[in-house]
């Protein structure tokens, strides 16, 4: 039979795994495993095989391409999001999960509509822009005004007497996301306090090639709502150069953005039942919604598919872990966190399972080259997890930092559940974040598979451990 090596290993990869696991389950080594160890020898061996399987898998990456190309961006309230969710549920059913279901969640429904901005003085220029998520529109008309540039909220206060009737541009260099994003989130509130008619930000990004970046923004009761949008870093710097030359800057803005009534969406939940402690849960996942530009491949299609693929590989191994592995793909992380909040409340009040949520894992930092995980929990649990970390040295993903989590597992962590977030090489994350550049082609198959391997090792390791992860 004339077949390639890749075809041979793809076709026959299950046979040696099942045979080897059978031998391991009946080996003297397994029977004499160290009773004080968090992981048995058999669990460690299964983890090793899961890692190897993850590194050669093609299905997960192909599914990420399918999600990205056929459904694209998936903003809460959109048909694309619900169509993607239905496709995922159908595929999960094929994978052999013991239970797959959709959990209803009401989510915000903001629609961007048509929008544009132009620089009118001192030159004529189209300004690539994106309205920020939750912003109002311009009331069906073009809004024009003189621009006042500020570099911080303190600078805004210092110039407050010059603000009334003008458009405020926050031109703040990117330092860290946490420091810089405040101008996106709160910029409209602060500018409106002093009489601005609209506000812009230089996009929250570490690098730009004339790409504006969107993201959530907020209003505050009692303060007028004004349109709030992002322009590119390049255009913000251009405007600053004109201002330094003494030029007056005038901009026109048109936005059709609207907020509609809440819409029905869903969390996706899939389970592998535990063989000994089925009520004890290891949760892993990401958020299935995205912003309404690009494909949402990096943020967070990759995180969702990586968690799903990690669980699928556990099914494929034929070894059922002692505890239940639950994949949760949360809806509405980007502009409301409704999916995560609803899941945590449901787990606490309806399922009554918070105490049996052993560990919550999240991947929402891209699926670039993995470094390991950041963990928030007890010192004893940290030491237990270190046994798993050491199994990931061959792919350079053995880092286990103290402190970690994620937005979607945050509500669970606030209720006492230990949490951990996947850490990756993040240099390019904010190049693409919340922009039209977040597309599948930015991702690398090898990096993705290593992320899957890292997630699978922790998910199976904790689920099959001899001891319950310490609180």
Residue spans for each PLM region:
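Extracellular/luminal Protease-associated
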Residues: 78, 127-227, 396-398
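Metal-dependent peptidase/peptidase-like ectodomains
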Residues: 124, 140, 228, 277, ...
């Amino acid at each position: 039979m004339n077949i390639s090596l890749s075809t041979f290993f793809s076709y026959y990869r299950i046979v040696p795994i099942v045979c080897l696991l059978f031998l391991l389950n009946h080996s003297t080594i397994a029977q004499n495993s160290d009773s004080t160890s968090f992981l048995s020898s058999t669990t460690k061996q299964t983890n090793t095989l899961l890692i190897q399987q993850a590194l050669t898998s093609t299905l997960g990456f192909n599914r990420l391409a399918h999600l990205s190309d056929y459904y694209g961006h998936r903003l809460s309230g959109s048909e694309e999001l619900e169509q993607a969710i239905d496709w995922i549920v159908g595929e999960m059913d094929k994978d052999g999960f013991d239970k797959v279901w959709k959990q209803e969640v009401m989510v915000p429904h903001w629609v961007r509509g048509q929008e544009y901005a132009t620089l009118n003085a001192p030159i004529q220029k189209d300004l690539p822009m994106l309205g920020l998520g939750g912003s109002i529109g311009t009331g069906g008309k073009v809004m024009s005004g003189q621009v006042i540039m500020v570099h911080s909220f303190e600078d805004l206060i210092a110039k407050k007497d010059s603000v009334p009737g003008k458009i405020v541009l926050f031109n703040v260099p990117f330092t860290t996301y946490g420091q810089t994003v405040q101008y996106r989130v709160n910029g409209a509130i602060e500018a409106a306090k002093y009489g601005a008619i609209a506000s812009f930000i230089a996009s929250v990004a570490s690098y730009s090639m004339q790409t504006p970046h969107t993201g959530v923004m907020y209003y505050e009761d009692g303060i007028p709502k004004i349109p709030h949008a992002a322009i590119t870093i390049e255009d913000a710097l251009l405007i600053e150069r004109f201002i330094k030359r003494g030029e007056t800057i005038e901009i026109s803005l048109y936005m059709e953005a609207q907020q509609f009534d809440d819409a029905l969406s869903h969390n996706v939940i899939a389970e592998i039942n535990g063989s000994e402690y089925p009520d004890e849960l290891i949760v892993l996942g990401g958020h299935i919604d995205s912003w309404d530009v690009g494909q949402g491949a990096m943020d967070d299609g990759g995180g969702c598919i990586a968690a799903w693929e990690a669980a699928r590989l556990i099914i494929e191994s034929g070894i059922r872990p002692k505890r239940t592995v639950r994949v949760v793909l949360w809806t509405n992380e980007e502009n409301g966190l409704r999916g995560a909040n609803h899941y945590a409340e449901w787990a606490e009040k309806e399922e009554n399972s918070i105490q049996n949520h052993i560990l919550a894992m999240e991947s929402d930092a891209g699926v670039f080259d993995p470094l390991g995980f950041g963990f928030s929990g007890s010192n004893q649990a940290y030491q237990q997890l270190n046994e798993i970390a050491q199994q990931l040295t061959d792919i350079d993903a053995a880092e286990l930092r103290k402190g970690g989590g994620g937005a979607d597992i945050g509500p669970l962590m606030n209720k006492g559940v230990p949490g951990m977030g996947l850490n990756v090489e993040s240099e390019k994350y904010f190049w693409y974040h919340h922009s039209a550049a977040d597309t599948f082609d930015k991702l690398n198959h090898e990096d993705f598979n290593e992320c899957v391997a890292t997630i699978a090792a922790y998910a199976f390791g904790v689920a099959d451990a001899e001891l319950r992860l310490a609180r």
